[in-house]
Every structure is written in structure tokens, then in C-alpha cells.
Amino acid sequence: LHRYKFVRILNKVLLKGILLFYKRKFKLNDPIAWTYNPMVLELMESLSPSKKVYHSVDDLSASPGIDSQALKEEEARLLKKMDVVFCTSKNLYNHCSKIAGKEKTHYFSNVVDYEHFSKAKTDLAQPKELKNIPHPRLGFVGALSSYKVDFDLIKQVADERPDWHWILIGKVGEGQPETTIEDLQHRPNIHLLGPKDYKDLPQYIKYFDVCTIPCPKNDYTDSMFPMKFYEFMATEKPIIAKNIDSLSDVTHAHFSYSKDSDFIEGVESILSKKSHDIIVWQELVKENTWETRLNKMFKVLQS
């Protein structure tokens, strides 16, 4: 519905009323207006904030069902008025810094709730749904939408390696309702478990043999930094991921593939290893926790 101008205007009016109510209720005289939504410049300014912050986490103009041109125009207007801009990928940084200026734009990748996902290293019981699924297990957690997940790759690997079992956790069609999964459902080694509570994810990931980020190459994925990358890393499970731009700096910490055949070779390589470079993973994760990242962001805001 957000593609319709009337809906966008109505959303802004409603949100403005809610925010002004809470601003008065909590007596917020000099709030910092921090948004992930590029369509709310006037709303931010109505709060009379001490600083305006835009946190760019995805190329939203490349999302299905979005009025790309309207979003790009609104984002450009917003970027020119921001005091600080944070970006979660280098492609987003390059885009935003051209409009907002490099002195205002800062690159910080996505992060992990380490305390939560590191629970996978503890003695958690195996979920009942997994007990009858053979090993090796290739796991994925996230939105099961075709612009985010390469379903053709998953089907190909399932057919070529019938002894490998895919475990897919997430809502089908999130952000893309037309997504279909009939071809996946008919394969005995692809297990669609549906969405799970956030609190239970470590319990499932603990029993994966390989964590996968099998995204397609497109305008959306070219600018995303997968939240699940550091979440998987915090569990100390090996990761194989598509060679998207945002992960180019961390290829030493996971297996990166470009072709479908590389994926199969990568999984075989991972499964043949008895140990992995846990120390490198631990160092990377420590640099990319919510606590570490917020401290760095607050320093930027205070400067």
C-alpha cells in the first residue's frame, strides 16, 4: 500500500501525532530524531530536534512494491538536511555521502546481540522438529523471499546432494507476498520450519552443521549487510555466503562463493574440516556487538 501517495501522507499524519504526544508526555525538549525511513523529513523537523540522524540499512528503493522514484527523491531531500548519516554497507555509504557529504556520513556494518546468539555454544536441547532430520544440515534463518534468497540454488544443491538437508527458518514472502515455495516443499531434503521466536533461534542454529547466506545478486543485495552474518558468527558455526560487496572485507572469516558450483565445493570443504579459526571469529564478533557499535555512534553524535 505504501506505493500510494495517499497512504504515505496518512501514515505521516498519524505518526506525527503519536510522536508529538510522547514528546510532550516525557518532556523531551531537545530530542535526537533518528530514522531508518527516508520518507519522514517533515516529521523529523516537526520535533525540533537537536540533531537529525538518518540510519541507512538497505537500498529500500530496490525493494518490491516500492515507488522507487518517489523514495529516491524523498531520500535525497532528507540526506541534504541530516546532521549525521550512518550506513551499514559501503555501497550505501558511497551513495549517501555523495548527497550528504563525507564529513557527515559514517560506515558501520550491521551488528549482533552477542549475549543472545552465543547461547548456541551452551548446552541447549535440540528442538523436536530437528531430531528426525539427518546430518549434514545446511541452515538458513531469515525472510524467505525471492529477492533475498536464491531458491534456485537451494533446489539445485538439494537435487545434487540428496544426503544434505536444508533447514529453512523464516516467514515465506515477507516483503514479497508473491513468493512461491512449491518447488521446495516437494523435496524430501528441504525442511521449511516457518518463523520461530527470536528467543529460540540459538537453539536451532546450534544444531546446524553449516550456516548459509544464499542470497541472489541484485540491486537490493548489492547494498545490504546481512544481519545474520554476525549472528551466525556468534554461534561459532561455519558460514558460507554469496560474494556480495558488503562481505568482501570479511572473506577470511567465512567461505565466499560466486557460482553455484562453488557453493557445493565450499560446503564440502567446510564439512571436511575438523576445526575452524574460532579466534578470528571471536575477535570480529567483539568488534561488532550492539554495545561496541552504539559507543562508536554516540561518540560521532557528541563530536
What are these regions (language model features)?
Residues 130-148, 155, 167:
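Conserved donor-binding/catalytic core segment of Leloir-type glycosyltransferases
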Residues 170, 178-202:
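Nucleotide-activated donor-binding/catalytic signature segment of Leloir-type glycosyltransferases, i.e.
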Residues 17-24, 68-85:
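Membrane-proximal helix-turn-helix segments that form the acceptor-binding/catalytic region
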Residues 146, 199-204, 211-233, 241-251:
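Nucleotide-sugar-dependent
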Residues 91, 108-120, 208:
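Carbohydrate-associated surface elements
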Residues 275-302:
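A charged, aromatic-enriched C-terminal amphipathic alpha-helix characteristic of glycosyltransferases
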Residues 62-68, 97, 112-130:
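Acidic anion/phosphate-binding donor-loop and adjacent secondary structure
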